[in-house]
Amino acid sequence: MAETLEFNDVYQEVKGSMNDGRLRLSRQGIIFKNSKTGKVDNIQAGELTEGIWRRVALGHGLKLLTKNGHVYKYDGFRESEFEKLSDFFKTHYRLELMEKDLCVKGWNWGTVKFGGQLLSFDIGDQPVFEIPLSNVSQCTTGKNEVTLEFHQNDDAEVSLMEVRFYVPPTQEDGVDPVEAFAQNVLSKADVIQATGDAICIFRELQCLTPRGRYDIRIYPTFLHLHGKTFDYKIPYTTVLRLFLLPHKDQRQMFFVISLDPPIKQGQTRYHFLILLFSKDEDISLTLNMNEEEVEKRFEGRLTKNMSGSLYEMVSRVMKALVNRKITVPGNFQGHSGAQCITCSYKASSGLLYPLERGFIYVHKPPVHIRFDEISFVNFARGTTTTRSFDFEIETKQGTQYTFSSIEREEYGKLFDFVNAKKLNIKNRGLKEGMNPSYDEYADSDEDQHDAYLERMKEEGKIREENANDSSDDSGEETDESFNPGEEEEDVAEEFDSNASASSSSNEGDSDRDEKKRKQLKKAKMAKDRKSRKKPVEVKKGKDPNAPKRPMSAYMLWLNASREKIKSDHPGISITDLSKKAGEIWKGMSKEKKEEWDRKAEDARRDYEKAMKEYEGGRGESSKRDKSKKKKKVKVKMEKKSTPSRGSSSKSSSRQLSESFKSKEFVSSDESSSGENKSKKKRRRSEDSEEEELASTPPSSEDSASGSDE
C-alpha cells in the first residue's frame, strides 16, 4: 500500500466558484492547496470522524467531517478511484469510506437538519442539498418564513442570492419554530453584526487603498473601517495574508492586508488594504476585555494593556485575531541597503519587495505574485536609457507584469536573488542587441566599452553613407557596385555622348535637360543597386531518400508502451501522458532499460551502415553533376566570345544605349545647327553597319576553334 496518494485535478466549491487544486493524502493527514489563491487546507488524521463518497456534478466527490464540526468537500474524482481511496482510509485513518447518494426526486418539501456548520435538507434518509452556514450573510424571519442571504463571490458566473424556507406552525405552546430555525442558522452563520463593544479602536489611520483616513474598530469576528464617506466591514475569514513592509526611507512602514473576496467602492474592487504608519508614532492600547478573557482567547499573544509603536500594535492585534502569520521581507538587500527596489509599474512609481516566497509591489496598484505562479522572469534593457532596466514576470496563466525604470546598480542583487530562488530566467537581450551576461551588465561604467552602442553607431554610419551615395550628383560608384558586364556602363556612355552632342543656344533648356538626366541617373543607380543585392540563400531541404536518425531507448520504449498507458489512464491528455511516461521510465529497473538500450544500439548501427551507403551513392552523383556544369560553362563562353569579334565594346554599348534612349534626350529644338543633323546621319549609318556585323554568322575558323575547345 502506498504511503501517499496525490490527485492533481481536484475542485473545491467556494461560494459558487469551482477552484482547482491539488489534494494529497498521507499517513499524517490530508492537505489541499488552492491553485488560484494558494490557500491550504490541512486536516490532521486524528481530527477526521467521517468520510463520504457520492456522485456530484463533476464526477464523484469526497466529503470529510472533523471533530470540531468543519466540513470539507472535494470534487472531480473518477469512479475507478473509489477502491484506492477506500483502502487508504481503512489502512491509515481507520475509517470506512461510505457511499451515499443524493436524492433526485425533485420534491420541495422535507426535513431540515443542522449538523456542525451545515444545513441539510433531507427527504427520508437522503439529502437533497446542503448549505454551508458560514456562507450565510443575513437571516431574516417573516410570519412563517425564514430567508437566508449569502455572501457573493466575484469569480462565480452564477451566484445564489437567497433561499426561502416555509416553516409550518406547530401545536406546541411556547416554542416558535420560525425563531428556532433562525437561531440555529445565526449560531453558525457568518453574519456581520456590530453588536456589543469593539475590542479596541485605532483612530484616524492613514489608508492608501482605499484612500483616506479611517477609524478601525476591531471586533471579535470582523474589522470595521469607518471613514467620512464609506464604511467597510471585513470578516476575518476573507483575510488571506498579512504583510509588514519597511519603506525605503526607513521612516515609514506599510501594513498590507490581502483580501478575498475584495471590498468594493462602487465599481472599484480593492484586493489589498494598505495602511501607512510612521515609525516614530507610539500608542498605549487597552483592550475592552478583562484579563481572564484575554488570556483564554488569545493564549498570551495579547495582553490587556500594551504600548509601543502604532504599526506594531496594529499588526500584533491583527495577527492574533486573524490567526495568520505576518510576512516580512527576507534576506534580500538592494544596492542602497534597503529591502526593496524603486521601480515603476504601469503609470505609477512604487516599491517592489522580493520576499521569501514571492514578490509584492506597493502601492498603486498593489500586486502580489507567488513564486509557484511564475512561469519565468526576464531582465530587459530599458528602452530610453542604459542607466536602467526592466524586470518582467510572466505567470503560468500568461499574465505579464513589467516593472520598469529599475536602477542599473540593482541588477546584480536582483539577479542573485532570482538565481537563488531557482526561478526560470528568459532573457530577450539578444533580440534587442544587449549582451545578457550578468557580470558585464552589473559592473559596467559609463566610460566602459558598450558593444551594443558601438554597433548601433556603425549601422548609422553605413545608412548615412548609403544616403550620401544615392544623393551624390557626381555619378561616382563604389567598388562593390562596379560590374563591367552590366548595363550601367552603357547608361554612363549614353549620358556622356548626349552631353557632348547636344549643344543648344538656349541655356535654360540645357539646364532643364541636365536636371532630368541627373534624376534619371539617380533612379537607374538605385534600381541597379537593388538588383545587385545578394540573393537570399534558400535553405536546402532534407533529402527524402536519406536514412532516418535512430530513436533513443526511451523513445523506442514510449512508442511501444503508449497504448498501454492510455488504456491504464483513460482520458489522459498528451501532456499528462508524457509526464506519466517519464515517471514510469525513471522507476524502471536497470535490467528492463538494458533491453531497450540494446535495441537503440542496434538501430544506431543500422543507421550508420545505411548512412555510409547513402553518402557513397550521393558522392558519385555529385561528380556527374559537376562535369555537366563544366560543359555548360564552356558552351556559354563560346557564345559570348562570338559577337565581340565583330565590333568593339564601345560601339556595342553605344548601340544598346541608343536603342533604349528616352524622349527626354531627343533634341526637338528648331534652332539647332546643321552639325546635329549630320551627326544623326552618321549615327544611323554606324547603326546599320553594326546591325550587318551582328547578323553575319561566325566564320568557319571561329566555329572550328570553338569545337576544338
From Swiss-Prot:
<dbReference type="InterPro" id="IPR013719">
    <property type="entry name" value="RTT106/SPT16-like_middle_dom"/>
</dbReference>
<dbReference type="GO" id="GO:0042393">
    <property type="term" value="F:histone binding"/>
</dbReference>
<feature type="modified residue" description="Phosphoserine">
    <location>
        <position position="667"/>
    </location>
</feature>
<dbReference type="InterPro" id="IPR035417">
    <property type="entry name" value="SSRP1/POB3_N"/>
</dbReference>
<dbReference type="GO" id="GO:0006334">
    <property type="term" value="P:nucleosome assembly"/>
</dbReference>
<feature type="modified residue" description="Phosphotyrosine">
    <location>
        <position position="452"/>
    </location>
</feature>
<feature type="modified residue" description="Phosphotyrosine">
    <location>
        <position position="441"/>
    </location>
</feature>
<comment type="function">
    <text>Component of the FACT complex, a general chromatin factor that acts to reorganize nucleosomes. The FACT complex is involved in multiple processes that require DNA as a template such as mRNA elongation, DNA replication and DNA repair. During transcription elongation the FACT complex acts as a histone chaperone that both destabilizes and restores nucleosomal structure.</text>
</comment>
<dbReference type="InterPro" id="IPR011993">
    <property type="entry name" value="PH-like_dom_sf"/>
</dbReference>
<dbReference type="GO" id="GO:0006281">
    <property type="term" value="P:DNA repair"/>
</dbReference>
<dbReference type="InterPro" id="IPR009071">
    <property type="entry name" value="HMG_box_dom"/>
</dbReference>
<keyword id="KW-0007">Acetylation</keyword>
<feature type="compositionally biased region" description="Basic and acidic residues">
    <location>
        <begin position="534"/>
        <end position="546"/>
    </location>
</feature>
<dbReference type="InterPro" id="IPR024954">
    <property type="entry name" value="SSRP1_DD"/>
</dbReference>
<comment type="similarity">
    <text>Belongs to the SSRP1 family.</text>
</comment>
<feature type="cross-link" description="Glycyl lysine isopeptide (Lys-Gly) (interchain with G-Cter in SUMO2)">
    <location>
        <position position="296"/>
    </location>
</feature>
<feature type="compositionally biased region" description="Basic and acidic residues">
    <location>
        <begin position="577"/>
        <end position="624"/>
    </location>
</feature>
<feature type="site" description="Cleavage; by caspase-3 and/or caspase-7">
    <location>
        <begin position="450"/>
        <end position="451"/>
    </location>
</feature>
<feature type="modified residue" description="Phosphoserine">
    <location>
        <position position="657"/>
    </location>
</feature>
<feature type="compositionally biased region" description="Basic residues">
    <location>
        <begin position="515"/>
        <end position="533"/>
    </location>
</feature>
<feature type="compositionally biased region" description="Polar residues">
    <location>
        <begin position="696"/>
        <end position="709"/>
    </location>
</feature>
<dbReference type="Pfam" id="PF21092">
    <property type="entry name" value="SSRP1_C"/>
</dbReference>
<dbReference type="InterPro" id="IPR048993">
    <property type="entry name" value="SSRP1-like_PH1"/>
</dbReference>
<feature type="modified residue" description="Phosphoserine">
    <location>
        <position position="471"/>
    </location>
</feature>
<dbReference type="GO" id="GO:0006337">
    <property type="term" value="P:nucleosome disassembly"/>
</dbReference>
<feature type="region of interest" description="Disordered">
    <location>
        <begin position="458"/>
        <end position="709"/>
    </location>
</feature>
<dbReference type="InterPro" id="IPR038167">
    <property type="entry name" value="SSRP1_sf"/>
</dbReference>
<feature type="modified residue" description="Phosphoserine">
    <location>
        <position position="659"/>
    </location>
</feature>
<dbReference type="Pfam" id="PF21103">
    <property type="entry name" value="PH1_SSRP1-like"/>
</dbReference>
<dbReference type="GO" id="GO:0031491">
    <property type="term" value="F:nucleosome binding"/>
</dbReference>
<feature type="compositionally biased region" description="Basic residues">
    <location>
        <begin position="625"/>
        <end position="634"/>
    </location>
</feature>
<feature type="modified residue" description="Phosphoserine">
    <location>
        <position position="672"/>
    </location>
</feature>
<protein>
    <recommendedName>
        <fullName>FACT complex subunit SSRP1</fullName>
    </recommendedName>
</protein>
<feature type="modified residue" description="Phosphothreonine">
    <location>
        <position position="170"/>
    </location>
</feature>
<comment type="subunit">
    <text>Interacts with MYOG (via C-terminal region). Component of the FACT complex, a stable heterodimer of SSRP1 and SUPT16H. Also a component of a CK2-SPT16-SSRP1 complex which forms following UV irradiation, composed of SSRP1, SUPT16H, CSNK2A1, CSNK2A2 and CSNK2B. Binds to histone H3-H4 tetramers, but not to intact nucleosomes. Identified in a centromere complex containing histones H2A, H2B and H4, and at least CENPA, CENPB, CENPC, CENPT, CENPN, HJURP, SUPT16H, SSRP1 and RSF1. Interacts with isoform gamma of TP63. Interacts with FYTTD1/UIF. Interacts with SRF. Interacts with NEK9.</text>
</comment>
<keyword id="KW-0945">Host-virus interaction</keyword>
<dbReference type="GO" id="GO:0003677">
    <property type="term" value="F:DNA binding"/>
</dbReference>
<dbReference type="InterPro" id="IPR000969">
    <property type="entry name" value="SSRP1/POB3"/>
</dbReference>
<dbReference type="GO" id="GO:0006260">
    <property type="term" value="P:DNA replication"/>
</dbReference>
<keyword id="KW-1017">Isopeptide bond</keyword>
<dbReference type="GO" id="GO:1902275">
    <property type="term" value="P:regulation of chromatin organization"/>
</dbReference>
<dbReference type="InterPro" id="IPR050454">
    <property type="entry name" value="RTT106/SSRP1_HistChap/FACT"/>
</dbReference>
